[in-house]
Amino acid sequence: MSPAALKNMEENKTTVMTTSHSSNDGGETVKGYSDAVEVRFSDFCKSGLALDENTCTQAIKLFKDTKHLLMTNVSSIGNGTSEEAERFWFAFVSYSVKRLSEKNRDDAQQKSDDPGLTLCQILRLAKLNIVDFFKELPHFIVKAGPILSNIYGADWENRLEAKELQANFVHLSILSRHYKRACRELFLTSDASSDKQPAISNEATHVSDHHRFGWLLFLALRVHAFSRFKDLVTCTNGLVSVLAVLIIHVPVRFRNFSFNDSQWFVRKGDKGVDLLASLCNKYDTSEEVLRKSMETTNNLIANILKKKPHSASEYKNENLVNINPDGLIYYEDLMEESSLQSSLNILEKDYDDAIRNKAELDERVFINEEDSLLGSGSVSAGSLNITGAKRKFDLISSPTKTITSPLSPHRSPASHANGIPGSANSKMAATPVSTAMTTAKWLRTIISPLPSKPSAQLERFLVSCDKDVTNDVIRRAQIILEAIFPSSSLGERCVNGSLQSTNLMDNIWAEQRRLEALKLYYRVLESMCTAEAQILHATNLTSLLTNERFHRCMLACSAELVVATYKTVTMLFPAVLERTGITAFDLSKVIESFIRHEESLPRELRRHLNSLEERLLDSMVWEKGSSLYNSLTVARPALSAEINRLGLLAEPMPSLDAIAMHINFSSGCLPPVPSLQKHETSPGSGQNGDLRSPKRPCTDFRSVLVERNSFTSPVKDRLLGNLKSKLPPPPLQSAFASPTRPNPGGGGETCAETGINVFFTKINKLAAVRINGMIEKLQPSQQHIRENVYRLFQLILSHQTSLFFNRHIDQIILCCFYGVAKISKLNLTFREIIYNYRRQPHCKTLVFRSVFVDWSSARHNGRTGQDHVDIITFYNEIFIPAAKPLLVDVGSAGTTVKASNVPEVGNNKDGQCPASPKVSPFPSLPDMSPKKVSSAHNVYVSPLRSSKMDALISNSSKSYYACVGESTHAYQSPSKDLNAINNRLNGNRKARGTLNLDNDVGLVSDSMVANSLGLQNGNCASTSGAALKSEQSDS
């Protein structure tokens, strides 16, 4: 190890001690620091937050119990200083106590004279912003989780609702931007008669009273009407209804539009502008939905503000000139100066009462111009393009920032960009709101009109089974979807004041979502059955259509797409797994088929499913309670002892009757079907699920947000050949058969062995993509280790599979990088590896900050039990003892040795399952995120690195290619050439020959060219193993 690396290691080792000592004039002992920080927290609670005695006592107790965690993790919290770490810890503890203790109170206690406490108040006192708070909160949850569980019970994480709160913040950030943009477009911030400058010239430095009124009215809708289901689509519809109210009532002198001039106002007949139709056309909602939302908003105004409604058609006012008044309601003086301030005060008080003492986000922060509290990040139009200081926000919110996944197929090239022909605003830059509304339009226009029962074609398949399973399928769908989208019980709370209970709206919402999921389920199931029948050359699909687990996976996938469409805050993944009784491994089997068999699926939902598949494969399938382990015990008996010792096996999947009883389901005229659970429930079947996915250390805290996500099209797959088998897809029924059952086409394999081999192939493919992404961030002189890193990963997956148990595959990849760097004598530190990992779109800081270890499995200086440690400790204590023989093998063999010549490892503890995939060279990969070419923008060309260009183009063929930097005309510059290309692309286009450049099936990547030339991956020299020593990671 280099002297510089040793110095860094020693500096990092002493970070905690140094910061602790320096926190109080440089002379404070550890014990003194501990006592002093406790005193400071006590003052924070009593004087700063003014907590009541009971809550304050609880907070101080929790702080004492977790204080040692603060002191040992100072360097990894915030910027690494003890002062900032303290402020974060103070906020975490006070938020957790307030939130969890509040859940233990009854409503009578909550309605006391307690002034209340919101998250914003906590953060103001701690001098933190919301973005940074959510960025660091997962680390506190992982570290303090066992302590919180002991104090508040096993369900503390569900009651804390931290992920839901974060999702709520992201959605409100998006909605507030959407609302501000609309207000700037429609209204002036000052009287037009005195100031002709529109609001758009003043970058939101001033929020008008009209703007404030609209946002507070929207918050009242969220509190009183939307109840538990504050999904993005419903909220957007509510916001559009608020805009309609503003357009009708804001005095004409504040308007920044004219009904005669504006192109987006729709006229029907000679009665004037149809306002609701115009808003629906602009914001991709439906008139039926908007009218219902308008009715709710109008009732809210009448009940809270005590305003008398008038029919607009019977009321004469200059605000209503040029507007078709049919069906509209007008409130006299609603937004005139004489009553506006009073209305604002009433709405403020109503909101104060609603959030009192709940430690929730004060949603008024988005119009209070408190940028310091919101943080430096913001949502930009089209996507969350974060630059500079704003990049932090991207760590916790990226609704549309996606890359494609190599794990599942793309949609058919014939399908439309969004699954909807001729969707509106196709040339406008997409925003998170417009994307959500377009996706919801797909559900509304393509799925909702379908019948809510099996089609005639599907029914033919159901009847063709050994026995008619139609009633079984219908009953199961009803029960499972009722479990996923439950109706409100009669005993649930009602809203304050004179407004009626929100139960009715909740029930309507749930019923609509159940119907959409049901229709989608039947549609895809029919398509799958048709494809399966073609593969098997038979219409009797008994094995598949009587498989309980398969149907639950299909229902879960359909429901998840509905939830993702509406972006429902209170039903974040893996809620569908928990409510259907399946596991992540089960769901991963159907995602690819689901995408293949629903060609109309919008791009955003395809991305969501691929993002989900990556998340399932990289961590969730490896968690405790995954049915993967049940299959592994059959496919790899040598792993059974370790699996049983760690208690990883999935529990039996709950019966359908048990779920029905749990949700108090009434099946109506359909009798109970005792035969439903005859399949897959025998002891030792190994395919049993768990009603609740076991809790994990919140490694996917950003689950609400769309993560790195990337897949290739069938066209690219055919061109790249080696990424996917050219054989027809295997029958689905073998994927869901009992693990011990022989696979009909598996050459003597059991279904478990076949399933594990397919699964390992996907894991290797995902690893190849991620290894390649990190390699590209390294220096050119370091990139030759790619083959060896990938080879080592494959060997570990095959020979030391237990290293993946309860861990994230990125943790193994990071260790592979460092191990190969050491045996190659490459000057690549763990700090550099982690720095490059941080730059990956799928990066999660918990991957290198918190790695699961089980000390009882080996001799570790007397340490016992299970723990979470940093990546360096895991590498030295667990990874190296297990993987060292494989590292030596990789180092001695080098990349020139063929995969078939890899020697067996002497101490192969896990063994290799029969017919498992051989170690293969690094595959040719498609470009992960090709820049889509839009007809409204210039073409973006990325320079080709000289090293890549030299590998791509040999001397003999160089004359056939034009490279960036070389002019295509005499005395021309590359910039002029690129401008010429842009001018040609963006020039006059004939309507009949519109070029659709939104589909990526026509893009040709460098990797395709490389494959077409038959180029092989470059070889690299590698030397034998060297001493493997510690470094401290940059945490």
Swiss-Prot record:
Region called Domain A, residue ranges: 431-632
GO biological process, alphabetically ordered: cell differentiation; negative regulation of G1/S transition of mitotic cell cycle; regulation of transcription by RNA polymerase II
Protein keywords: Cell cycle, Nucleus, Repressor, Transcription, Transcription regulation
Disordered as annotated region, ranges: 403-426, 674-697, 721-748
Region of interest: Spacer: 633-753
Entry's Gene Ontology cellular component terms: chromatin; nucleus; transcription regulator complex
GO molecular function, one term: RNA polymerase II transcription regulatory region sequence-specific DNA binding
Region (Domain B), start-end ranges: 754-885
Compartments, record wording: Nucleus
Function, in words: Regulator of biological processes that recruits a histone deacetylase to control gene transcription. May play a role in the entry into mitosis, negatively regulating the cell proliferation. Formation of stable complexes with geminiviridae replication-associated proteins may create a cellular environment which favors viral DNA replication.
Name this protein carries in UniProt: Retinoblastoma-related protein
Organism: Populus trichocarpa (Western balsam poplar)
